[in-house]
């Protein structure tokens, strides 16, 4: 499993890198500022970005340098979500301070700022690279048109109940959102300002903390405070597997590039890798001293294309 980046972080103020096949921790990076809320590997696989409260830090992956090579400062609350333009030209972040920010990875300072008027729980980038979709504590999903710099749509799946997590399929066929009541909402994007509710389901009886659609759009994974992860068939939203083994809340998950494996992070201080064909836990990663709340798995081929100017 060479070329695989597997990293975890959480409340013990460390980022740990793992050899995926053996379970050995190969490197520990200290993050003294705060807990780490989310981790993302850049498309070129050279860097990992860690977001906490309220800072965002960029670290080299293949290096022993313990210090961040760049910091992105501007948020005033927990940074809850982040991601990258597909070639790594820019990064987006969402925060409990009620804003979404866009950053040039190669420069200091925030490039754009969008006000949500509510704590932002989750943000995802539309595959067209021209829209961000956010979910907030007031129960709203918003679509942000990055060309026009406006909010092009706003809708509420379940009144004022907070939307915890949102994700869009790589082929833009489906948007999934979930809330603290364990309900998942499945939408068909008709246009930038029209998302049609296709299905809703009680995925868990407790919080859904993260919902993720796999790269080949075959599976939906839902992580829950009920200690399980459920794998759903995207074609008909039928349940395929319930992944059981974690002893406390499961906060985050990350699919492998070909959608065969899932990495999960839990308050039980461990991460796991699961085989999605069998639903079995293949390996457990031990070493954190407090809750693990984020995981990044990247076994894809690095995108080494140069970011376009402009």
What are these regions (language model features)?
Residues 9-12, 51-54, 94-97, 135-138, ...:
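Conserved strand-to-loop turn within each blade of WD40 beta-propeller repeats
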Residues 34-40, 77-83, 118-125, 160-168, ...:
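Canonical WD40 repeat/beta-propeller blade segments in eukaryotic WD-repeat proteins
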Residues 283-284, 288-310:
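Terminal intrinsically disordered, low-complexity extensions flanking WD-repeat/beta-propeller proteins
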Residues 14, 55-57, 76, 90, ...:
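A conserved positional marker within WD40/Gbeta-like beta-propeller blades
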Residues 1-3, 39-45, 83-88, 124-129, ...:
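Loop/turn segments within WD40 beta-propeller blades
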Residues 15-18, 56-61, 100-104, 141-145, ...:
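WD40-repeat beta-propellers
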Residues 25-32, 68-74, 110-116, 151-158, ...:
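Short C-terminal beta-strands that terminate individual repeats in beta-propeller domains
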């Amino acid at each position: 499993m060479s070329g695989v980046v597997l990293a975890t972080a959480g409340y013990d103020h460390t980022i740990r890198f793992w050899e995926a096949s053996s379970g050995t921790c190969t490197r520990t990076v200290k993050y003294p500022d705060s807990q780490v809320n989310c981790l993302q590997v850049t498309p070129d696989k050279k860097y990992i970005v860690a977001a906490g409260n309220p800072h965002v830090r960029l670290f080299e992956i293949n290096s022993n340098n313990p210090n961040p090579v760049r910091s992105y400062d501007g948020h005033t609350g927990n940074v809850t979500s982040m991601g990258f333009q597909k070639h790594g030209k820019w990064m987006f972040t969402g925060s409990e301070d009620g804003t979404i920010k866009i950053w040039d990875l190669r420069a200091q300072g925030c490039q754009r700022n969008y006000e949500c008027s509510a704590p932002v729980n989750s943000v995802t980038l539309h595959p067209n690279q021209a829209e961000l979709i956010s979910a907030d504590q007031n129960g709203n999903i918003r679509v942000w048109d990055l060309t026009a710099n406006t909010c092009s749509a706003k809708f509420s799946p379940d009144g004022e109940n907070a939307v915890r997590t949102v994700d869009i399929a790589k082929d833009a066929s489906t948007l999934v959102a979930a809330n603290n009541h364990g309900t998942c909402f499945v939408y068909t994007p008709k246009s930038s300002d029209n998302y049609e509710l296709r299905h809703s389901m009680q995925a868990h009886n407790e919080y859904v903390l993260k919902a993720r659609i796999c790269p080949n759009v075959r599976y939906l994974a839902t992580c829950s405070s009920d200690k399980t992860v459920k794998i759903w068939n995207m074609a008909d939203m039928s349940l395929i597997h319930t992944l059981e083994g974690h002893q406390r809340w499961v906060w985050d998950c990350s699919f492998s590039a070909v959608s065969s494996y899932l990495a999960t992070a839990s308050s039980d201080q461990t991460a796991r890798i699961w085989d999605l064909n069998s639903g079995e836990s293949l390996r457990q990663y031990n070493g954190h001293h407090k809750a693990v709340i984020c995981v990044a798995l990247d076994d894809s081929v690095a995108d080494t294309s140069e970011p376009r100017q402009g």
